[in-house]
């Protein structure tokens, strides 16, 4: 029987340099990058999801991006099935798969598997949406906090789709999402994950977040949103709930078309830009909380583009 293949896993909060480290390692170790991010599976939503553009990939193949249209549903189980095929193909070609993990649930699905969850209940979902109407966008999150505090701590208050799914699972099974996922998993076979975690100092991370928001706006984030909407994509599409997209889109109220959507970063209200920064910082904290529970991680107290991080990661993987 052949020994398990190496699987590099780079995890850490947004703006910590996971992609930079993965690309550097791929160049040194004959690898390919497998993105593990629930926002990057959607086509056309590029700037605000921090997809590495083709020029930035430096010739390194990147997988598991641009998989579905904005209106399509894509689950952690879908990710597991498709990513596992990619991992095995990369290994079969004699190359090292390098996973860049920003979405903890997707990483759990890939490495540990997910238990059989209850099927969707459209009746329950309709009741939840009806109850939340007129009570504000965070009503369902407050409800989830009472039913399943652990899930509420991991899910953003405005991520309605994930909140409804967590409530649905709790109501239908009488168990928390963690309890459901802990039972009946099918771990990934044939690979030995080598986890490398990025944990830069918080002040430095927050400074990078602020810088990246500015860079995204300068790169044409608003123009991207305008272009997506002009193709007929609904404002209700899930990717428009992602950080930054929802704040920018709020500048073009329903019924007023796109004429009120600011054309460039400087024309956005300062309060909107600050809200994007704040939401991103909160997201980074949630990611850190999730990844802190991961076992057997080689933690590096720096960013992924730090030469020391690259040097130490190569040593871990050889």
Regions of interest found by a model, annotated:
Residues 1-318:
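Phosphate/pyrophosphate-binding catalytic cores of soluble transferases and nucleic-acid-acting enzymes
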């Amino acid at each position: 029987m052949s020994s398990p293949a190496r699987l590099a896993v780079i995890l850490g909060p947004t703006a910590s340099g996971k992609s930079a480290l993965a690309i550097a390692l791929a160049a040194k170790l004959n690898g390919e990058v497998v993105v593990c991010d629930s926002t990057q599976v959607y086509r056309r939503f590029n700037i605000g999801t921090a997809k590495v553009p083709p020029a930035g990939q430096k010739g390194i193949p990147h997988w598991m991006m641009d998989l579905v249209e904005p209106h399509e549903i894509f689950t952690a189980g879908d990710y597991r099935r498709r990513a596992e095929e990619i991992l095995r193909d990369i290994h079969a070609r004699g190359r090292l798969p390098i996973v860049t993990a920003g979405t903890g649930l997707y990483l759990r699905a890939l490495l540990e598997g997910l238990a059989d969850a209850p099927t969707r209940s459209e009746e329950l979902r309709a009741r939840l949406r009806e109850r939340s109407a007129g009570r504000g966008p965070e009503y369902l999150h407050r409800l989830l906090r009472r039913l399943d505090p652990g899930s509420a701590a991991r899910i953003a208050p405005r991520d309605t789709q994930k909140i409804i799914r967590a409530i649905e699972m709790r109501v239908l099974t009488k168990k928390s999402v963690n309890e459901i996922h802990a039972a009946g998993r099918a771990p990934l076979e044939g690979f030995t994950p080598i986890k490398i975690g990025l944990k830069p100092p918080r002040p430095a991370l927050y400074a990078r977040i602020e810088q990246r928001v500015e860079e995204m706006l300068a790169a044409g984030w608003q123009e991207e949103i305008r272009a997506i909407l002009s193709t007929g994509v609904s404002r209700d599409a899930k990717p428009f709930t992602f950080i930054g997209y929802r704040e920018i889109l709020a500048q073009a109220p329903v019924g007023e078309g796109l004429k009120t959507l600011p054309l460039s970063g400087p024309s956005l209200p300062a309060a909107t830009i600050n809200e994007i920064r704040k939401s991103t910082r909160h997201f980074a904290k949630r990611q850190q909380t999730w990844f802190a529970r991961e076992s057997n991680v080689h933690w590096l107290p720096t960013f992924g583009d730090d030469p020391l991080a690259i040097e130490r990661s190569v040593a871990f993987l050889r």
